[in-house]
């Protein structure tokens, strides 16, 4: 059986993302695969190329042939040079700088703000009408009576 290492397409219309797979040469592009050995996101800066080197070396050693796009990716990661015994096996893969954590960003913004807002609110707070305030006080009083009655009922049940 002829085996190829090729790309299957994932993602949205203008945001392609690929999986690097090992599949029978006769299967269609997004068809059934034998094994997924990596992923490739070309739209990120720098492009994300994540290929399992150990599994790639195994499949190349048993005769799997990479397609042209995959061959370029393997040369970037250094897997092709490692397989062929050529110099440059370390590859020339660019690594993205690590993103700061959200906690660090929050603490930095808090330090800039000196722990509090520097300006007043842009909209004045709405004034509560007298009727709504009276209703709120009444509902609070009713709620307190209900909880007191419930507590008394609980006490009666426990004493029995």
From Swiss-Prot:
Statement: the UniProt record of this protein carries the keyword Ribosomal protein: yes
Chain spans, region Disordered: 115-139
A GO CC annotation given for this chain: small ribosomal subunit
BP term (GO), one: translation
One example GO MF annotation: structural constituent of ribosome
Disulfide cross-links: none
UniProt xrefs under InterPro entries: Ribosomal_bS16, Ribosomal_bS16_CS, Ribosomal_bS16_dom_sf
Keywords attached to this entry: Ribonucleoprotein, Ribosomal protein
Sequence ranges of Basic residues compositional bias: 124-134
Statement: the UniProt record of this protein carries the keyword Transmembrane: no
Pfam families hit by this protein: Ribosomal_S16
Membership in a protein family: Belongs to the bacterial ribosomal protein bS16 family.
HAMAP family to which the protein is assigned, alphabetical: Ribosomal_bS16
Alphabetized PANTHER family for the sequence: 30S RIBOSOMAL PROTEIN S16, SMALL RIBOSOMAL SUBUNIT PROTEIN BS16M
Name listed for the protein in its UniProt record: Small ribosomal subunit protein bS16
């Amino acid at each position: 059986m002829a085996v190829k290492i090729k790309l299957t397409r994932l993602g949205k219309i203008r945001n392609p993302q690929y999986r690097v797979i090992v599949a029978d040469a006769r299967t269609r592009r997004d068809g059934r695969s034998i094994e997924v050995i990596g992923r490739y996101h070309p739209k990120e800066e720098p492009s994300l190329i994540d290929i399992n080197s150990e599994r790639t070396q195994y499949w190349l050693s048993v005769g799997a042939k990479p397609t042209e796009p995959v061959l370029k990716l393997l040369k970037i990661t250094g897997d092709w040079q490692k397989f062929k015994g050529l110099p440059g096996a370390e590859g020339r893969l660019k690594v993205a700088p690590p993103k700061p954590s959200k906690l660090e960003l929050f603490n930095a913004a808090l330090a800039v703000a000196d722990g509090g807002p520097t300006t007043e609110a842009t909209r004045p707070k709405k004034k509560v009408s007298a009727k709504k305030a009276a209703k709120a006080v009444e509902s609070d009083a009713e709620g307190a009576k209900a909880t007191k009655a419930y507590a008394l009922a609980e006490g009666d049940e426990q004493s029995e």
